[in-house]
Regions:
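Acidic/His-rich segments in extracytoplasmic proteins that coordinate ligands and/or metal ions
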Residues: 126-195
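An N-terminal, globular interaction/scaffold subdomain
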Residues: 51-120, 129-133
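Hydrophobic alpha/beta core scaffold segments
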Residues: 295-309, 320-330, 334, 339-423
Length: 423
């Protein structure tokens, strides 16, 4: 742990005078970690989840290794067309998580606030903006984002486009779920195709795009089946694997690597032992850095996180033969688009599929969408027979504190569910 802290301080300090050196150090440190994921894997995890750790690290390294082939995206932007022109997508939430895991987030949060960014803005976005402003993040080829679910996107990506002076494309997703709105978004995605072809200099084959959408559909179907099968199984889990799935099941949809991960899950679950302890379904992001949460839910036979809503935000009910409409449908009918009730109902449905005994609604600092829906969520989950704990905190900024309260409230919740029955 001391090594990680020292590494983070070096990265933070170098950005003040030598941002290129800081970037090299960050890249080198992450490459070393990737070698560990590849050759010194955590044997407590299932093989699929070990593969996922390596896949996620590859995704975060690419913008540092080949920034000219990278595109900054918002988390729920469909990325199949970007993959088709050879761009590697990476997102604010994923990259900021890795900076936080490297204990290098504090200087970037402060940088963003010093530049006038509100303290109440999501800490993932502040960390990413600060890292860009201090020169740690290299210039991407372009930026593609959507207004879907997160209002911070509107500030962050316009600011980044102005800062880097790169082409930017915004996708407007209406609130209501209608055929007309699907068509409206599909037309924008056709414009995105033209945008990418113009700025990258490559042609996007519609037949190849259809193949990618077929792959995306299979991937989502595999993951849904896995979540159903794990209901009566014990799957050892840490706090980052559910987040990895939440990232890759969005920005890597359409890739063979992500489909391979879901295929491995289906093989692994066949060999998993019978369920042990209590199953917890997690709504929104996970404070992976929290010792209090780690103590209760990391590799514990008494209670495990069996799913995170970020990995199950859309259904595989689209037609790949109409690729633009298929991607548009994923966005318009996204579980976090529209009224909070849609999100809550999707969470209840997915929690029950995974055999959850209870759920945690994590009120991440600055996320109005989540904070505002908390009381309604508690009412609806408990009416559906699922006890729900509302837990406030920060998924990225460890200086947010509140560890004592987190430990007390989470411990009491699990004890109420019976998680301590074998003590």
């Amino acid at each position: 742990m001391q090594i990680i802290e020292t590494f983070g301080h070096y990265v933070e300090n170098l950005t003040n005078t030598k941002p290129d050196s800081a970037r090299w150090l960050l890249k080198t440190g992450w490459e070393a970690q990737n070698l560990k994921f590849r050759y010194m894997q955590d044997k407590r995890l299932m093989p699929a989840d070990r593969h996922l750790a390596n896949l996620m690290m590859d995704t975060m390294l690419r913008p540092l290794q080949k920034p000219e082939d990278s595109v900054i995206v918002s988390i729920f932007t469909p990325c199949e067309m970007m993959q088709e022109v050879g761009l590697h997508p990476y997102n604010v939430e994923g990259f900021s998580c890795y900076l936080s895991a490297s204990k290098a987030e504090r200087a970037f949060l402060q940088q963003a606030e010093n530049q006038g960014i509100a303290e109440t803005l999501c800490s993932y976005h502040k960390t990413f903006l600060g890292a860009a402003q201090k020169g740690l993040l290299p210039k991407p080829k372009c930026i593609v984002y959507t207004n879907l679910t997160c209002d911070a996107n509107l500030l962050t990506f316009r600011t980044l486009a102005d800062f880097y002076q790169v082409p930017v494309f915004a996708i407007d997703v209406p609130w209501n779920q209608t055929k007309e709105n699907v068509q409206y978004v599909a037309d924008q995605l056709r414009d995105l195709k033209v945008f990418l072809e113009k700025n990258i200099g490559k042609t996007i084959s519609e037949d190849r795009l259809k193949e990618r959408l077929v792959c995306s559909k299979r991937t989502l179907e595999n993951y849904r089946k896995y979540q159903q099968l794990r209901a009566d199984r014990y799957v050892p889990s840490d706090l980052v694997t559910p987040l990895y799935a939440g990232m890759t099941n969005n920005i890597l949809l359409g890739t063979a690597e992500e489909e391979k991960y879901t295929q491995m899950l289906l093989e692994d679950i066949k060999k998993a032992p019978a369920a042990k302890g209590k199953h917890i379904y997690w709504m929104h992001t996970i404070p992976f850095w929290s010792d209090a949460v780690r103590q209760e839910l990391c590799f514990s036979e008494k209670a495990q996180i069996v799913g995170c809503e970020l990995a199950e935000t859309c259904e595989p009910d689209f037609d790949p033969e109409n690729p633009f409409e298929a991607m548009a449908r994923r966005m318009v009918y996204h579980s976090l688009n529209g009224s909070a009730l849609r999100r809550i109902e999707a969470g209840i449905r997915h929690a029950k599929q995974a055999g959850a005994d209870g759920a945690v609604w994590f009120g991440h600092w600055g996320c109005k969408h989540t904070l505002g829906a908390a009381q309604l969520a508690k009412k609806k989950f408990e009416e559906a027979g699922l006890p729900l704990l509302i837990l406030d905190g920060d998924g990225c900024d460890r200086s947010h504190g509140g560890e004592g309260q987190t430990s007390t409230r989470l411990g009491a919740f699990l004890e109420m569910l019976g998680g301590a029955e074998n003590e």
